[in-house]
Amino acid sequence: MQTTTLNWDTVYAVPIDIVNEAIKFKHPTPEQFELLDGKYGDCKGSFQEWQIISGGDGGNIRLKIPIKNFKANVIGKYLSGTGGFESANLEIQVKLKYLPHFPKSKNKNEELVDLKIRTKSNNAEDPAIIIIPTSEDVKGFYFNEDVRSLLMTEDDQFIMNYFHRLIKEWLERNLYFFNYVFNTVNLNLYISNNEKWKWTKPSYVDYAYSEIDEDLSKSILGVLCMTDGRKGSKNQQQKIDPNAIPKTSQSGFLISEDRLLKNILLPTIPKKFPKSKGDEFEVVNQSAQGGTYSYILKLKEGKKINLDNINACGYTCTPYIQEMKVSLLGNYLRLESTTRVDLPLGVSSICETMCEYRFKLDKNDKGEQTIAYEQIGSPTNKQYTEKTQDVSFEIIKGLLIATLGFVLELVPGIGSFLAVALIGGTLVGSISLIPNFIENYNVNTAPSIDLSLENSVSEITWNSSDIFNLNYVALAGPLQLGGTLQVQNT
């Protein structure tokens, strides 16, 4: 299943039922509430545990607030009296906000921010609290000693609206009492340049909610991050893709295509070629069908990478990679390369290679989890020749006779290209290693994915002693990691 980070560097997605489980562990809900001198009277009652429910989207989060033993003295323009109910569920819509962690960390290398309910708003079109009217689950409703034993009437709903106004007024004054931290993110001020996976550390953060099938075990709350010192902009939407979590995992972590190519693949490719200077490659964002963009890691225009010398008919030649690109194609990546050798006969032999890979989870010799590459099918090789100088076939044939010790008969329509194909056959041995270089530079040389989790996932805590157990890695547009988040009771 394909997914997207929606232009964020990384996305950490957790199902809502796990978030609610963490809320229960902390018991942040105030037990009692009382409003005095309200605009529409007075009220009091008790709360049970608040929980996230279905109905939100993007930055909007809906909460269910169970209320017990509610009593009110209503003073309204069209209604006055005393009433209440034994129990009811109030639904509200709120937004969250990242705020500086309290108490402030004494570690100068940390900048902790907490995701909490936004308690204030100066924008009338974007209030801190929106009441979602409902009369479901109302039990023991009464007003002016008139107890309703049957279904609530329209008049009863009118009275309930006054009750809602009173509760909303208390919430607007006291919402900060629900002092729950949904998660804490460490926006690291200091990052060691020698540290592997350092680029995964968050430097800017936001959140988003995505509802899936009105199912809290599928709906997700996500932490959206820019990393390695980058900040957010209008290109980053406050949304999370509903497919951010792999089907086989409980929680998910995404690394964008741009970061995957620039920070995972780009540093590894030059190391495979001893004669590479390390600056020959770049990541470009090229347009694709439907107005979308795709990231490609490619050899820069005008650059080449020399390979080991070969001996062809007594001549020492240096084959070189003329073109190379790595493309992300949905759930796999494709490596395409063009390798060339220019022979002193006025002709060149060229080999085009294409191979494809999937990502998988593996372990290195140290027992650390790491990202590995698995080849799909067999590489394809296309070999051909080009005449680069105006050299007669008789001269080439003479060289072949002198160096190879056999007579090459002229084949009409092929000429010197047939001759150079024999010489260029030596090239195949050199470039045959190219389809395997990703696999060779694989498990034991790639940095441990544990370090990625340490610098990314572990910098985002949903409770004070989270454990994220990784069990899945694949390409799904971005690089998708899946695992199980264990939120422990502390």
From Swiss-Prot:
Keywords from the named record: Virulence
Function as written in the Swiss-Prot or TrEMBL entry: Part of a botulinum neurotoxin type A2 (BoNT) locus; may be part of a progenitor toxin complex required to protect BoNT during its passage through the host gastrointestinal tract.
Quaternary organization: Part of a crude toxin extract that includes BoNTA2/NTNH, P47, OrfX2 and OrfX3; OrfX1 was not detected.
Gene that encodes the chain: orfX3
Triggers of expression: The toxin locus has divergently transcribed operons maximally expressed during early stationary phase. This is part of the orfX1-orfX2-orfX3 operon. A longer botR-orfX1-orfX2-orfX3 operon is also transcribed at lower levels. The crude toxin extract was isolated from cells that had been growing statically for 96 hours (at protein level).
Protein name (database record): Protein OrfX3
Domain notes: May include a tubular lipid-binding (TULIP) domain (residues 2-258).
Organism: Clostridium botulinum (strain Kyoto / Type A2)
Highest rank taxon of the organism: Bacteria
Keyword Aminoacyl-tRNA synthetase attributed: no
Record note on modification: Shorter forms of this protein are seen in vivo.
Similarity comment: Belongs to the TULIP P47 family.
